Design a protein with these regions (language model features):
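Extracytoplasmic/periplasmic membrane-proximal domains and adjacent transmembrane bundles
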Residues: 169-348, 352, 357-360, 388, ...
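Hydrophobic transmembrane alpha-helices and their membrane-interface caps
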Residues: 354-439, 444-463, 489, 493, ...
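Extracytoplasmic/periplasmic
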Residues: 37-109, 118-123, 158-191
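Transmembrane helices with small-residue packing motifs
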Residues: 21-58, 110-112, 145-148, 458-470
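Short, hydrophobic beta-strand segments
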Residues: 28-30, 47-57, 97-109, 143-163, ...
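Solvent-exposed, membrane-proximal periplasmic/extracellular interface segments of envelope transport
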Residues: 26, 62-144, 199-220, 228, ...
Length: 535
């Protein structure tokens, strides 16, 4: 069969290359029309998750503890939840955090998938009033533990930033796929400001520092001494403050402050207590004020795909000129990684081209050798289309860089054999035909051994010799599926097409060279004859 195909390839090389190109374009079209998107890093089955309990507003310690206990009780009885560690209190990083429950799952082969289990957890805690629940799965690989979608809104005016934030959140709520949406808007609440009239205070001989000391008596207290008990080497700090029942705003107004002439004057003479809206933490990015939105993505959906939908939704929204919207998170990571690995791929291709040019001393044969890389990309996208997997920016790109160094070996062998037959006196068609037949078995066997070695990783197989069993889909094997699939798919596709396309390209190269040479000779003869006649 291969003899017949090879004969057609060398006798009709242009038709053969056209059909090969059509097949590659078809694989590209099939993949991109399926809109499978891209993926920054493989989704590894997590072994644990953190349930974050968030609540806006001031809650007492007992109310916070009650929310955490209710959350822990709701998820403890779910099948697949092994151990829970509950903690009440903020962590200093997450805004509005009341507490958290760290959940360790059962073994992956004894429960449903983590995505289904986390969905059950969301359903079990949705009845909790006054709380917003975020469930964050353990994340492997680069990208940190943050949410994959992050939108940064920067500007100079908080009112404009808040309006833009509300508009974008409304758009996100309408798009199916965004979950656990949160932002960095300050929690609603009041804060009391003590406005001191410095002129009146100075008239009574009262300093701002002394006023601050008196106010501390009603808040955290004033340090008056240090005390070291006999049974310890560490000193204890002694603070003085009012009893709990006296620590209130009314008492603050009645607080008497000593003056320079020995009198005690109410604090209200020097200061006015005014309520104001709580401002919260002011975040900045590159000197501009920042509002941010973060979100998780539903299982089975890709963050870049949802971000593109959101971008199209907000294209028609007119924001003030001072407001800038930037998509960070996984979208930013993908762009940076693509740029870095893309440069690495180009650099490796340039190095290989230089080595091949020195080896073959022929630009055309170097181009033919490097064409195997283009052929391999068709196999990569065809396999991704058939398996309905997104293109992995990290692992698939690394696989492509590794594949580039593997697939050119077949062409090097074919072209080297082709040149050997040429030196023996065969013409281009005969040399290309005989090179294909001679090297068919070595090329196929080399490719098969490589592909078979990758099969366990492609199908996520884990062979446990001590247990005498084979596991499918273990978390440890999920790391390498994209990398191995890229190499195996590209090598399979490129190997068979190389055995057809390379002989055809070698014939086309010779034909093209003769055609160009004949045209140049004819043109020169015409000019010379014209000059002779005119003379």
């Amino acid at each position: 069969l291969y003899k017949d195909i090879l004969k057609i390839s060398v006798t009709r090389p242009i038709l053969s290359i056209f059909l090969v190109g059509l097949l590659i374009v078809g694989s590209y079209t099939a993949y991109f029309s399926a809109k499978l998107g891209v993926q920054f890093f493989p989704d590894i089955e997590p072994e644990q998750a953190v349930v974050q309990i968030l609540s806006r507003g001031d809650l007492s310690a007992s109310e916070k503890n009650s929310l955490v206990k209710d959350t822990e009780a709701s998820i403890s009885n779910l099948n697949g939840v092994d151990i829970n560690f509950a903690k009440t209190g903020a962590d200093g990083r997450t805004k509005d955090l009341v507490g958290s429950v760290r959940t360790i799952f059962s073994d992956w082969d004894e429960r449903e998938t983590a995505a289904d289990l986390m969905e059950s957890m969301r359903g079990s805690v949705k009845f909790l009033e006054g709380a917003n629940i975020n469930i964050v799965a353990q994340k492997e690989g680069p990208g940190g533990q943050g949410k994959p979608v992050r939108i940064e809104i920067t500007g100079t005016d908080f009112d404009q930033l808040n309006k833009a934030l509300f508009v974008i959140r409304q758009k996100m709520n309408k798009i199916d796929g965004f979950i656990d949406i949160s932002d960095n808007l300050p929690s609603p609440g009041l804060e009391w400001n003590l406005n001191i009239d410095r002129e009146i205070a100075a008239r009574h001989g009262v300093t701002v520092a002394s006023l601050g000391t008196m106010v501390k008596l009603l808040t955290k207290g004033v340090k008056v001494s240090d005390y070291r008990p006999d049974d310890t080497d560490e000193e204890l700090e002694v603070f003085l403050r009012y009893i709990k029942s006296e620590r209130n705003l009314d008492r603050l107004q009645e607080l008497r402050v000593p003056t320079s002439d020995g009198r005690y004057v109410p604090l209200s003479v020097f200061a006015e207590l005014t309520p104001e809206k709580k401002g919260g933490t002011i975040s900045r990015l590159d000197g501009n004020r920042l509002r941010s939105i973060e979100a998780n993505v539903k299982e089975g959906m890709q963050a870049p795909f949802l971000i593109e939908k959101l971008k199209s939704e907000i294209e028609n929204v007119t924001f003030p000129k001072s407001v800038s919207v930037n998509f960070a998170g996984e979208d930013e990571d993908i762009k940076e990684t693509q740029a870095f690995l893309g440069q690495s791929l180009v650099f490796s291709l340039v190095l290989m081209s230089i080595v091949l040019m020195i080896q073959f001393n022929s630009a055309w044969q170097t181009i033919v050798t490097m064409s195997a890389i283009i052929l391999s990309t068709g196999g990569i996208f065809l396999l991704l289309f058939l398996t309905e997997r997104p293109f992995g920016v990290v692992m698939s790109m690394l696989g492509l860089i590794a594949l580039a160094g593997i697939v050119v070996n077949n062409n090097i062998v074919l072209i080297d054999t082709f040149n050997e037959y040429k030196r023996k006196g065969h013409n281009h068609r005969e040399a290309a035909y005989m090179a294909g037949l001679t090297r068919f078995r070595p090329v196929i066997l080399t490719a098969i051994t490589t592909i078979l070695g990758l099969v366990p990783m492609v199908f996520s197989l884990t062979i446990r010799f001590s247990e005498r069993d084979i596991l499918v889909g273990a978390p440890s094997s999920q790391w390498w599926v994209d990398l191995s699939s890229t190499i195996a798919g590209g090598l399979t596709f490129a190997t068979f097409l190389t055995l057809i396309a390379t002989p055809a390209l070698l014939v086309i190269g010779r034909t093209s060279v003769f055609s160009i040479k004949n045209k140049l000779v004819t043109l020169l003869k015409t000019k010379l004859s014209t000059k002779t006649v005119s003379t």
